[in-house]
Each structure stands twice: as structure tokens, then as C-alpha cells.
């Protein structure tokens, strides 16, 4: 009887271990499955993203963003852009062909970039102080806004303040630069749900300064997070589903790690007005 009881306990222990192992595997597998992306080049993906964004952003802002996406994808969508969400792997876009198609339709209007699209989405959710801006590095943005008639005078002023160049020190210490960005953004009031994730770049061509080199919008979903971005003026929109904020931080940190040079600090991430310490 004792022997039978011992065998039963052993079998129960093995079964428990198997169940734990399966649960861990399922959790890992589920997390891996969550990282998926789309270039919004299908009606289904566009409607899904519109629905998610509309839960956290002003309807007019979302509509304007969707119109920009449609214009871009209607123009260059034939160049291998993805429609429905698919597993997220390294993306590679034919910029030369995209540029050719875009220019044929839009002439000298270069389109929109990450900053223009982020402001389009978040303009009703960020309280922007009326302070002096440094627009030295926004020359392409300003040209696009002017030629595309994208913003009125007030929106352009707020856009330039949000993405102003920020003075810093001649150091490679990211903590020093992050403090300067945090001090600048203390003047702003950001939204807790629709978050602005920025990749901040150190530049010293005309004195040491900090600049939002890339930016996108992160919003919560029922199970995870959605990050939307326009990669560059030429490169497409990406909507990426992440399991966690940290996964999105890692994506941005890895993708833009080489946006630096001799004597410069490495790029760093800001979540709204706070530095994300990845070390």
C-alpha cells in the first residue's frame, strides 16, 4: 500500500512538472506571437488600427492620420508593403522605387515623417507651453508642412515647440542629456494612455544639442500595446503589436543604436517626458 502511494505521489509530481513546463512554454510562445506588424496596406488592418487609436485619441486626429496613411499607401503600396498583421521580422523597403512613385504623383512635396504623424495624432492630447523653439533641424519638416498645407499657423508653432532642439553639454553621459530633455518636457503635460515614445539623438555640428530623431505613438490594447510610426519621409508606416512597453523600448533602442558618432552620446528613449533607462 505504501509502495502504491509512493508511486502515485511520484506520478503526480511528474504531472505537475509537465503542466508547469507547458504553461511556461505557452506563455513564451504567446509572447512571441504578440510581436506582429503591418504597413496598414489593407482595409482590415487600417480599420483595426483606427479602432484601437480611437479609444484613446480625438476622432479628428485619428481621421487625419488615417488619411495620410491612405495617401501614402495608395501611392506606393505596390512596393511590397504588408497588409494584414504578420510576424514582425527585420523589414527592408525599396526606398528608391518608393521615392520614384511618390515624386511622380506629388512633385516636390516630400510627404510626412515620424514627427509630423505623431503630432497629427497627439495634438489634442498634449498641453504645449508657449515657449521659444529652436527649429534649426526641422527644415525638412517645415518644408513638408508648408508644401503639403498640413498644419495651420498655431499647429505649426506647437509642432516646432514640441520637437525643438534642446541645448545640452559636451559629454557622452546619457544621464546628463536625459536630464536636459526631462527638464524641457517638464513644461508639457502628456497623456497617460496615448504616449509619445521618442528616440533622442545627440548632435554637435552647431553646439551640443538634443533632437527627437524618431518618434511614434504607443497606446494600450486589450492584451498588449500598439505602436504606430512613420519610419521616414520615404519609408512606410508601421503598426507594431507588442506584449509590453519594454518590448517596444527594446525595439527602438536596437533599431536606432547606430544614430551616433565620435564624441557623441548614444541615442536614448523618452516615454512622454521621462527618460527610459535601458541599462
Kindly label every feature range from the protein language model.
Residues 8-10, 16-279:
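Cysteine-nucleophile amide-bond enzymes
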Amino acid at each position: 500500500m505504501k509502495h502504491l502511494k509512493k508511486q502515485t505521489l511520484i506520478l503526480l509530481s511528474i504531472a505537475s512538472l509537465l503542466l508547469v513546463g507547458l504553461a511556461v512554454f505557452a506563455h513564451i510562445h504567446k509572447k512571441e506571437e504578440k510581436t506582429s506588424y503591418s504597413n496598414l496596406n489593407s482595409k482590415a488592418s487600417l480599420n483595426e488600427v483606427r479602432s484601437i487609436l480611437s479609444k484613446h485619441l480625438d476622432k479628428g486626429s485619428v481621421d487625419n492620420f488615417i488619411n495620410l496613411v491612405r495617401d501614402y499607401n495608395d501611392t506606393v503600396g505596390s512596393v511590397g508593403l504588408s497588409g494584414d498583421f504578420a510576424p514582425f521580422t527585420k523589414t527592408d523597403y525599396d526606398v528608391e522605387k518608393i521615392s520614384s512613385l511618390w515624386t511622380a504623383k506629388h512633385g516636390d512635396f516630400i510627404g510626412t515623417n515620424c514627427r509630423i504623424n505623431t503630432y497629427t495624432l497627439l495634438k489634442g492630447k498634449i498641453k504645449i507651453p508657449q515657449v521659444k523653439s529652436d527649429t534649426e533641424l526641422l527644415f525638412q519638416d517645415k518644408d513638408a508642412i508648408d508644401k503639403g498645407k498640413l498644419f495651420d499657423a498655431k499647429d505649426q508653432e506647437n509642432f516646432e515647440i514640441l520637437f525643438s532642439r534642446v541645448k545640452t553639454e559636451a559629454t557622452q553621459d546619457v544621464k546628463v542629456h536625459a536630464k536636459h530633455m526631462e527638464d524641457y518636457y517638464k513644461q508639457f503635460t502628456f497623456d497617460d494612455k496615448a504616449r509619445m515614445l521618442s528616440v533622442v539623438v545627440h548632435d554637435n555640428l552647431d553646439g551640443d544639442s538634443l533632437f527627437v530623431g524618431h518618434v511614434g505613438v504607443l497606446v494600450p490594447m486589450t492584451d498588449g500595446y500598439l505602436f504606430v510610426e512613420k519610419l521616414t519621409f520615404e519609408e512606410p508606416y508601421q503598426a507594431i503589436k507588442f506584449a509590453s512597453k519594454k518590448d517596444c523600448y527594446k525595439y527602438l533602442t536596437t533599431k536606432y543604436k547606430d544614430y551616433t558618432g565620435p564624441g557623441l552620446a548614444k541615442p536614448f528613449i523618452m516615454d512622454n517626458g521621462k527618460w527610459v533607462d535601458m541599462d
